[in-house]
Amino acid sequence: MPARRRWFENRPVLKRIVLAVLALVVLPYVLIFFYLLPFIHPVSTLMLRDLVLLRGYDRRWVSLDEISPVLVQSVMMSEDGQYCFHGGVDWAEMRMLVEDTLKGQATRGGSTIPMQTAKNLFLWNSRSFVRKAMELPLAVSTDFVLSKRRLMEIYLNIAEWGPGIYGIEAAAQHHFKVPASKLTRRQASLLAVSLPNPIDRKAGKPGRGLRRLAGVIERRAQGSGEYIKCIYE
């Protein structure tokens, strides 16, 4: 037996740690295939955190057919206009993000909906290069395995829309007292633009800046026909 392998075998604690880390790395890729099944309703790491801390949360799973199309249009135009055309990562956007970072300039988020979904399902919330490096292959794998419709359905059912508010049905009921299927264009656009910072951006009580952003997204959503074909064709 080589000396290096013998050294490793003689340290059972280290061996268990390495195996546990490997299992944690592989587990998300296994779960992606389980999420192909429509009756499985995934939860996010933030939901799990709330459960562990005994905070509780509100999430009511709904199928994509039970969500107003104007909400889907608004979210896509706000968060990922190229959703139907990339394979999980918008590499042109990522390239600009890296260039801005190297120049020391303020950077945009650059996260596609598959990237946000991978982060919400498997990773932590705070920004770091380590998280981003893990997020990219998970996003590509998620986009490859799941259909665009299923991926969007999962995203809209795990996204955070306020403290303890997860998923579009709970968000619509909490902010506007209507089901997700009955959201208006203005309500949908307000929910969409609150996604980057759902704790501070209150869709149900928007300030002037949020209303202005929502107006821009509302207009974009009305002309989004070509951009959403992968969802509704």
From Swiss-Prot:
<comment type="function">
    <text>Peptidoglycan polymerase that catalyzes glycan chain elongation from lipid-linked precursors.</text>
</comment>
<comment type="similarity">
    <text>Belongs to the glycosyltransferase 51 family.</text>
</comment>
<dbReference type="GO" id="GO:0008360">
    <property type="term" value="P:regulation of cell shape"/>
</dbReference>
<keyword id="KW-0997">Cell inner membrane</keyword>
<keyword id="KW-0808">Transferase</keyword>
<dbReference type="GO" id="GO:0008955">
    <property type="term" value="F:peptidoglycan glycosyltransferase activity"/>
</dbReference>
<dbReference type="GO" id="GO:0009252">
    <property type="term" value="P:peptidoglycan biosynthetic process"/>
</dbReference>
<dbReference type="GO" id="GO:0005886">
    <property type="term" value="C:plasma membrane"/>
</dbReference>
<dbReference type="Pfam" id="PF00912">
    <property type="entry name" value="Transgly"/>
</dbReference>
<dbReference type="GO" id="GO:0009274">
    <property type="term" value="C:peptidoglycan-based cell wall"/>
</dbReference>
<keyword id="KW-0328">Glycosyltransferase</keyword>
<comment type="pathway">
    <text>Cell wall biogenesis; peptidoglycan biosynthesis.</text>
</comment>
<keyword id="KW-1133">Transmembrane helix</keyword>
<dbReference type="InterPro" id="IPR001264">
    <property type="entry name" value="Glyco_trans_51"/>
</dbReference>
<dbReference type="InterPro" id="IPR036950">
    <property type="entry name" value="PBP_transglycosylase"/>
</dbReference>
<feature type="transmembrane region" description="Helical">
    <location>
        <begin position="17"/>
        <end position="37"/>
    </location>
</feature>
<protein>
    <recommendedName>
        <fullName>Biosynthetic peptidoglycan transglycosylase</fullName>
        <ecNumber>2.4.99.28</ecNumber>
    </recommendedName>
</protein>
<dbReference type="InterPro" id="IPR011812">
    <property type="entry name" value="Pep_trsgly"/>
</dbReference>
<keyword id="KW-0812">Transmembrane</keyword>
<keyword id="KW-1003">Cell membrane</keyword>
<dbReference type="GO" id="GO:0071555">
    <property type="term" value="P:cell wall organization"/>
</dbReference>
<keyword id="KW-0961">Cell wall biogenesis/degradation</keyword>
<dbReference type="GO" id="GO:0016763">
    <property type="term" value="F:pentosyltransferase activity"/>
</dbReference>
<keyword id="KW-0573">Peptidoglycan synthesis</keyword>
<keyword id="KW-0472">Membrane</keyword>
<dbReference type="InterPro" id="IPR023346">
    <property type="entry name" value="Lysozyme-like_dom_sf"/>
</dbReference>
<keyword id="KW-0133">Cell shape</keyword>
